[in-house]
Design a protein with these regions (language model features):
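Active-site glycine-rich loop that binds ribose-phosphate moieties when present
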Residues: 19
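Amphipathic, well-ordered alpha-helical segments in soluble domains
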Residues: 8-15, 37, 41-44, 48, ...
Length: 128
């Protein structure tokens, strides 16, 4: 394994660490939309992986892959909107820096889910 794989924490842990060490005491409402997309993406990955065991006979595996990709696109849009909201409404530079990190890592969670879906799709295509 390359060095980065061995020492990289998972994406959700990255979000939690930012909340912890930046001592974030209250949650911005716009972050909840990103969190909701992350949860849906993780749930969809779980469903996809259950179907993956029988991918040759699965009727829903492809739908799960498409749903994960769609959720990642939604997260990209919410990320841009949230960052814009943060930078136009917040006047505290420290708060801006802290929340930029949180938003960034929340979006990376959906990127990671999409990566899993991409790998599953590649495996299915190679073995079909």
């Amino acid at each position: 394994f390359p060095y980065t794989t061995l020492f990289r924490s998972d994406k959700i842990e990255d979000v939690m660490l930012r909340l912890y060490y930046n001592n974030i005491q209250s949650i911005r409402p716009d972050s909840l939309e990103l969190v909701s997309i992350v949860v849906k993406s993780c749930d969809m990955v779980k469903l996809m992986l259950k179907e993956f065991a029988s991918f040759r006979h699965s009727k829903s595996l492809r739908d799960h892959i498409i749903a994960i990709n769609t959720l990642e696109e939604q997260a990209d849009q919410v990320f841009v909107t949230s960052m814009r909201e943060l930078h136009t409404t917040c006047t505290d530079p420290v708060e801006i820096i802290c929340w930029r990190e949180v938003y960034f890592y929340l979006e990376k969670c959906t990127d990671a889910c999409e990566h899993v879906a991409d790998v599953v799709e590649q495996i299915v295509m190679k073995n079909s």
